[in-house]
Structure formats: C-alpha cells, structure tokens
C-alpha cells in the first residue's frame, strides 16, 4: 500500500493543503507549530477514524469553520483508490472510498494500514495496562478483521451483562438468564485473549532481535501477556465472581479485555 497524495481543507491550521508523496521515505521538516504533526494526524485519522491525540471531531476543524475535508489518494495491490473523510461540528464524520460510503469503522480499518509513533506513545511503557491494551486493539484491528469482530461482540455482551446485573436487583428471577450471557462473554473473551497472546509472542521475537543489536546480545527483553485463560477456566472464574458482581450492582470483575502485556 502506498499513499500518493493528501489534500486537506479547513483541517486544524490549514485552509487548504495539497501535497504529493514520493516513493520510499518522505521527510517533513519545518519550524515548530507549523502543522507537521497535523499532516500525520490527518492520515492516521483517515485510516483509523480516530485522532491519536484523542481530540473530538469538532476540535479538528479550523477555527470559525463548520466542516473539514480530508482526501487521500492511495495505491493498494496495484489499484488506485481515493478516500474522502468529511468532518462536521454537529454531525458524525462521513467516510467514503471511491465514492462508496463506509458505514462502519470496522470496514475502514485495514484499508490504509498505518503505524504512528508519537510522544504520546511513550504511555505504552510509562502508563498502566490500559494504554497497552489500546495499542494492541489498534494494531490487531488493522491486521485481523476477525479480531475486531470478536472484540466488538465481547464489548457489546459485556454492556448487556452489566445492565442485567443492575436489573437483577429489582427482578431477582432474571438471575437465571445470567449464565447465558456468561457463556457468550467467555466465548468472545477467550478469542480476544488468544489473538493478543499470539501477537505479543510475535512482537516479543521482533523486539528481542532489535534489542540484541542495540546491546550486542548482552541483555534480554521479555514481553509477556499476563493471563493465560482457556475457555473452561475463564468460565469457572467468572462463576466464582458472580456474587461479587451481583453485589456491585452493574460491574463484571473478570474482564478479558483488561488483561495486558508486560
């Protein structure tokens, strides 16, 4: 995949911008606060639907303007494509590839595979597990469409289970339906864990090779996933925590998506 050109209109500090990229490495340079990071952010946003800075869409639109537009011309498997993204202050963003609307973010992820390294990424090692989970989810969602499917379903079921825990306080007979949600939660949660473990193993091997070069083989680096839960053990542990879940009103204490890499 190659990005050939980028056009911006009313994005951040840009009234209009049109730039072509050369094959190979492209270097952006200039004075501070001139918009270099904004260019990278616009590409990342178009590929993932999210800003790496965590900004809301309205904050990406140039001051005193109501909407912004990003267009990317890219080549994939020898075929040219155009991605258009419209940002509006009071509406959800619109995305289309070759004029065909993209309705779900899951259909966009992986179309333009990107890896962004910014100062914010130091949170992966400096902050808690949530930042590492976020990194895993972004990378895996671009690489494995099935992972995104499993994660999306897991999160939906988790919300439903937590809502059920709240309802059980007022309708105790609903407790009989909890096991059905547990089975679904474990089904998708176990798959999420498997994908993450596989990714961490592969990433660990790559990191070890790079670290060997940097240290002359004198030091070792180890990446581990902190939980090894199979389907049966996950279901058993979830059942053990059921009373605790019920007492907390609407919270599932054993959550597959909150395991992490260390």
Stretches found by the model and what they are:
Residues 252-259:
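Conserved small/polar residues in nucleotide/adenosyl-binding loops
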Residues 15-19, 79-83, 221:
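Short beta-strand segments
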Residues 57-61, 226, 251:
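Short, solvent-exposed loop/turn elements at beta->coil junctions and helix N-caps
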Residues 196-225, 230-250:
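Amphipathic alpha-helical domain-onset/packing element
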Residues 48-131, 140-143, 147, 204-209, ...:
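Nucleotide-state sensing region of NTPase/ATPase domains
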Residues 1-45:
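Pre-Walker A-like glycine/lysine-rich segment at the N-terminus of P-loop NTPase domains
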Residues 123-215:
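An accessory alpha-helical subdomain
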Residues 45-49, 259:
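Post-Walker A connector loop of ABC transporter nucleotide-binding domains
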């Amino acid at each position: 995949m190659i990005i050939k050109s980028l056009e911006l209109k009313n994005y951040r500090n840009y009234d209009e911008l049109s730039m072509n990229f050369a094959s190979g490495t492209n270097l952006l340079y200039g004075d501070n606060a001139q918009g270099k990071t904004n260019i990278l952010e616009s590409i990342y946003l178009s590929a993932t639907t999210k800003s790496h800075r965590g900004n809301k869409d309205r904050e990406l639109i140039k001051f005193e303007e109501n909407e912004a537009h990003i267009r990317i011309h890219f080549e994939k498997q020898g075929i040219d494509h155009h991605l258009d993204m419209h940002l509006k202050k009071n509406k959800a963003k619109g995305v289309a590839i070759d004029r065909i609307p993209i309705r779900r973010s899951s259909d966009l992820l992986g179309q333009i595979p990107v890896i962004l390294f910014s100062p914010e990424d130091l949170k992966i090692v400096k902050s808690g597990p949530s930042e590492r989970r976020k990194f895993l989810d972004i990378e895996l969602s671009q690489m494995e469409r099935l992972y995104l499917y499993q994660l999306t379903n897991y999160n939906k079921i988790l919300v439903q289970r937590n809502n059920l825990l709240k309802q059980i306080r007022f309708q105790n007979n609903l407790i009989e339906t909890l096991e059905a949600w547990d089975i679904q939660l474990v089904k998708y949660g176990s798959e999420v864990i498997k994908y993450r473990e596989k990714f961490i193993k592969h990433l660990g091997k790559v990191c070890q090779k790079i670290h060997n070069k940097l240290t002359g083989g004198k030091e070792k680096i180890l990446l581990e996933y902190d939980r090894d839960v199979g389907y049966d053990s996950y279901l058993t542990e979830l059942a053990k925590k059921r009373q605790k879940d019920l007492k907390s009103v609407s919270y599932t204490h054993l959550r597959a998506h909150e395991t992490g890499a260390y």
